[in-house]
């Protein structure tokens, strides 16, 4: 079902949209490396869609009671967007949790294009990228003075 293609399903409700959709970078795999802002949104979210094959479940374990949790590992784009749009239509805060930083191999462009098509507001919360975490783990820096 190409839910997001049927604009008439949501256009007349557009004025009722109250919450943003958040794309959250979960960091490089260590649940403690999610940003403070990312964790706050996960805690407040009514609906969480996370890449379960890549994002440790511990990242979303702080969710509030009653939050709807979806593992997108078994979902296609249509299914993810159907959940996102329906939740947003009901005024729910949606957290779409990606591994690393959503803008690096996060495949968020196609999701953002669909949200743009319907005038749904969203925000991207960056995550700690693995290249930065790797430098920290091996105690190296990327820039050296006088080099």
Regions found by a protein language model. Give the residues of each.
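Short, Lys/Arg-enriched N-terminal segments with co-localized hydrophobic residues
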Residues: 2-17
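Glycine-rich, flexible N-terminal cofactor/catalytic loop recognition
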Residues: 18-74
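Glycine-rich phosphate/diphosphate-binding loops that line cofactor/substrate pockets in enzymes
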Residues: 41, 83-92
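Glycine-rich, highly charged phosphate/nucleotide-binding loops
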Residues: 73-85
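Class I SAM-dependent methyltransferase SAM-binding "motif I" and its flanking Rossmann-like core
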Residues: 101-147
